[in-house]
């Protein structure tokens, strides 16, 4: 009988099987808070590795960017086609305090706006707010039929497009440069700038679907904790001291 390896015999494995550790057991859950400019403050939860050694959990959270639907932040389905970017600037306890980082349209909404027989007009401008945030605003507009128009097409002439674009840049520059980032966010939510452009260009060519389709944050000023806490409806520690009334008792030394 040939001597060889019998595969049927069960043989003990070398070494001990390594115990698998659940990666989520090393993570902590933090709440993401939106600024007070939005109706719904609780954005959601985010996970981060627990602080260990030189790795701090707060450092891992700062700078994270979350993309949230404006419909969820405003509790209104009419804003479902707009997305807001929020950046974590500060961590307090288990809360991540965020600030506005940008705005964008969903792809399906942009595709649905582009149609035949009309002119598309786009404009963009780089502007600095009063609190030194450098932003780039992108606007989009479409021509529409005049009242009692029989002609099917609504194409604007090149001179009219240039005049409309000039107006769009002027209005965006004026509206954004005269306010802070929080005030600009208040204007962007109800689309105040879009309506202003539509009204101002009525004499050149009637427009429809005028939107600020994108807001890009190019440069932020030096981080100010007090400004961020005010934005979240919180305040820093009060500098003024409070008078403490205390009964003064003169210390009597016993004679030696």
Swiss-Prot record:
GO terms for biological process: translation. SMART domains: Ribosomal_S3Ae. Keywords: Acetylation, Cytoplasm, Ribonucleoprotein, Ribosomal protein. Residues 1-18 have a biased composition (Basic residues). Its main location: cytoplasm. The modification N-acetylalanine is found at residue 2. HAMAP family: Ribosomal_eS1_euk. This is Small ribosomal subunit protein eS1. It comes from Aspergillus fumigatus (strain ATCC MYA-4609 / CBS 101355 / FGSC A1100 / Af293). The lineage of its organism: Eukaryota, Fungi, Dikarya, Ascomycota, Pezizomycotina. The gene is rps1.
